[in-house]
């Protein structure tokens, strides 16, 4: 019987495989094998200034040296490719657009400098910084589209309901966590 277990290791090809990455790969591989699952290798090549194909090949060789094989990924393919993050950008853009279209996400135009200033002001007031202040959450969608079309930089943020109360998840190790 096939297992539903699917685990992924996504090293960044910005250098050689380091000990922490090797440990994570070994744990994921062992978990997949122990549960009859699938071990997926996906290359996280999203740092264009430091990622290289040569480093990706070095990582693949290191994983083979460790005795690790992968069921899906570079050189072996699979049903859920591509297996390099930069080749998946269209998939991510489609998913992000869907979230925005459904009202589950919104564009934020706050600059790094604005966010740093918010953090610094909270520190000066000795207030605990509560993170992003949702400044762009309720922007008119047409204004947001105009700003995007004008080439203004933005990120897409998840539109978490404001009246959600505590978010509680079940963690397999820690139980209920808020």
Predicted feature locations:
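N-terminal Rossmann-like or analogous alpha/beta NTP/dinucleotide-binding catalytic cores
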Residues: 1-124
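Active-site cores that bind ATP or allylic diphosphates and position pyrophosphate for catalysis
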Residues: 106-107, 111-178
């Amino acid at each position: 019987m096939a297992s539903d277990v699917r685990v992924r290791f996504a090293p960044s090809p910005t250098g050689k495989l380091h000990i922490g990455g090797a440990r994570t790969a070994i744990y994921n591989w062992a978990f997949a094998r122990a549960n009859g699952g699938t071990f997926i290798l996906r290359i996280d090549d999203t740092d264009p200034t430091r990622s290289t194909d040569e480093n990706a090949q070095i990582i693949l060789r290191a994983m083979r040296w460790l005795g690790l094989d992968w069921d899906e990924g570079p050189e072996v393919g699979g049903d859920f490719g591509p297996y390099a993050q930069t080749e998946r950008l269209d998939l991510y853009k489609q998913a992000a657009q869907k979230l925005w279209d459904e009202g589950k996400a919104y564009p934020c135009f706050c600059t790094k400098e604005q966010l740093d200033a918010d953090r610094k002001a909270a520190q000066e007031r000795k207030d605990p910084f509560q993170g992003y202040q949702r400044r762009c959450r309720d922007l008119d969608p047409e204004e947001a589209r105009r700003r995007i079309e004008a080439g203004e930089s933005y990120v897409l943020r998840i539109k978490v309901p404001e009246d959600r109360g505590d978010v509680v998840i079940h963690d397999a190790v820690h139980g209920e966590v808020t």
